[in-house]
Amino acid sequence: MRQITVFIVDDNKELRNALEEIVSMSEGYHCIGTASSAEEAVDRIPIVRPDVVLMDINLGTEESGIDVVKVLKPRIPDTNFMICTVYEEDEKIFEALSAGASGYILKKTPPGRMLEAIRELYEGGAPMSSQIARKVV
């Protein structure tokens, strides 16, 4: 089975490293890069062209993860973007999905479910944390 390549964007170094470790230690997944800012993400993601990008919304700068999705999705349409955030507000959810994100999960999602969500997104699904799905449907 082909490994799913994942790129992680989060301004929190500890969380970014934890997500990278979860992905890298799991069979069938490979973390091919990380970024801590919107600028770094916009520069690096089109070069490595991952299957899935885990994208935080708040990147500690004026540009958000949603802004990054808006810029990159038209440039690399085969890459799937999944928002991974603490925000549960309707406005953020719909803004992210409108920008081109295909999934939306909360950071409190257990690691096993997060990996399932990555695979589901890669296989054409639209994974969401249950709290988010209730707001969307």
Residue ranges and their predicted role:
Residues 92-98, 108-137:
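Short, flexible helix-to-coil linker/hinge segments that flank and couple to helix-turn-helix
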Residues 43, 66-78:
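Short amphipathic alpha-helix used as the core "switch/output" element in two-component signaling
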Residues 56-58, 85:
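Active-site residues of response regulator receiver
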Residues 2-15, 19-23:
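Conserved acidic segment of CheY-like receiver
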Residues 11, 84-88, 107-109:
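Conserved active-site segment of CheY-like receiver
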Residues 34-52:
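Acidic, metal-coordinating helix/loop segments flanking the phosphotransfer/catalytic sites
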Residues 51, 58-60:
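The short loop immediately C-terminal to the conserved phospho-acceptor aspartate in CheY-like receiver
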